[in-house]
From Swiss-Prot:
Any one GO molecular-function label of the UniProt entry: unfolded protein binding
Keywords annotated in UniProt: Cell cycle, Cell division, Coiled coil, Cytoplasm, Cytoskeleton, Microtubule, Mitosis, Phosphoprotein
UniProt-recorded name of the protein: Nuclear migration protein nudC
Cited function: Plays a role in neurogenesis and neuronal migration. Necessary for correct formation of mitotic spindles and chromosome separation during mitosis. Necessary for cytokinesis and cell proliferation.
Family, as annotated: Belongs to the nudC family.
Keyword presence, ATP-binding: no
Gene transcribed to yield this protein: NUDC
GO BP term, pick one: cell division
Ranges spanned by the short sequence motif Nuclear localization signal, renumbered to the chain: 73-81
Disordered as annotated region, ranges: 66-181
Taxonomic placement: Eukaryota, Metazoa, Chordata, Craniata, Vertebrata
Sequence ranges of Basic and acidic residues compositional bias: 71-132
CS domain: residues covered: 177-268
Length: 341
């Protein structure tokens, strides 16, 4: 009984190692390799003479047609994927350019509506009430000194973290930053940048300078000081990065990150930092990552949320569960005076 189509597909690559080694020995390329196969069949088998006339030729033709059909199908699917990715990048770039243009045209001082003003005042009042409640919390007695010292230590750590985050920008809706001359957004795997130029003519490729390097980026108008010229926060894949001009006024740049496990806190070294703790991970497309990387990123996101709420990380929770299980299995042991880190 022959193999099913699925089983055949699974076994298709089992001889790749041997065939690849053979191919590397043929300096004449595919033509020489194919000639070797037919030479082997002629010298060591009855492939050409063992059957009726035309049988061997039909077998070769059928096999060629089968694999040619598969190859053409794979090429079309790959082309469709690339086209979909290109269209998605173009749509994202257009959206970014539109937002940057709107940002540039909006007045710096924005008048609030009555509803917005009422909501803002409500938030201020709630914060004042919360502060009053904190100030009115009674001091704990001496018997709670142990817990109090731990609490104070945690508060000190939190204060130090808050101190380190002072002055950092809040991320925009795209987990990046809206700066005076440009706007950038990011996911874990890529970054998009929009630079609107206030010119009286439609920009063309010859009018701009865009230089994307592994660790450096330069963008500007020819004959003018560059808008961006600095060292990137981290390395990018130059061959998978791109740029284009939107609406004749805005240059958009797409950068593919090499390290897909981190958030950038700035685009280039001269930029102000954003507070990566306030990034919204849900905006990142985890579906684009492979299963192993995705699980690591999800763990990282979970731990980040736990830390922000003062709760144990996944590793810390695992240790606590192991300790709890051990204590349950040994009720005869006294853990009341034991200290755990």
């Amino acid at each position: 009984m022959g193999l099913s189509a699925e089983e055949a597909a699974e076994q298709e690559d089992r001889f790749d190692g041997i065939l690849l080694a053979m191919a590397q020995q043929h300096q004449g390329g595919v033509c020489e390799l194919v000639n070797t196969f037919f030479s082997f069949l002629r010298r060591k088998t009855d492939f050409f003479t063992g059957g009726e006339d035309g049988v061997a030729e039909k077998l070769i033709t059928d096999s060629f047609n089968h694999h040619n059909k598969l190859a053409q199908k794979e090429r079309k699917e790959k082309k469709a994927r690339q086209e979909a990715e290109r269209r998605e990048k173009a749509e994202r770039a257009a959206k970014l350019a539109k937002e940057a243009k709107q940002e540039a045209n909006e007045p710096r001082i924005k008048e609030l509506t009555d509803e917005e003003a009422e909501r803002l005042q409500l938030e201020i009042d709630q914060k004042k009430e919360a502060q009053k409640e904190v100030n009115n919390v009674p001091v704990k007695s001496s018997e709670d000194d142990g817990d109090s010292s731990d609490s104070n230590k945690q508060e000190t750590d939190d204060e130090e973290k808050d101190e380190n985050d002072k002055g950092k920008l809040k991320p925009n809706a795209g987990n990046g930053a809206d700066l005076p001359n440009y706007r950038w957004t990011q996911t874990l795997s890529e970054l998009d940048l929009a630079i609107p130029f206030k010119v009286t003519f439609r920009l063309k490729g010859k009018d701009v300078v865009v230089d994307i390097q592994r660790r450096r980026l330069r963008v500007g108008l020819k004959g003018h000081p560059p808008v961006i010229d600095g060292e990137l926060f981290n390395e990018v894949k130059v061959e998978e990065s791109s740029w284009l001009i939107e609406d004749g006024k805005t240059v958009t740049v797409h950068l593919e990150k090499i390290n897909k496990m981190e958030w950038w806190n700035k685009l280039v070294s001269t930029d102000p930092e954003i507070n990566t703790k306030k990034i919204n991970p849900e905006n990142s497309k985890l579906s684009d990552l492979d299963s192993e990387t995705r699980s690591m990123v999800e763990k990282m996101m979970y731990d980040q949320r736990q830390k922000s709420m003062g709760l144990p990380t996944s590793d810390e929770q695992k240790k606590q569960d192991i300790l709890k299980k051990f204590m349950e299995q040994h009720p005869e042991m006294d853990f009341s005076k034991a200290k755990f880190n």
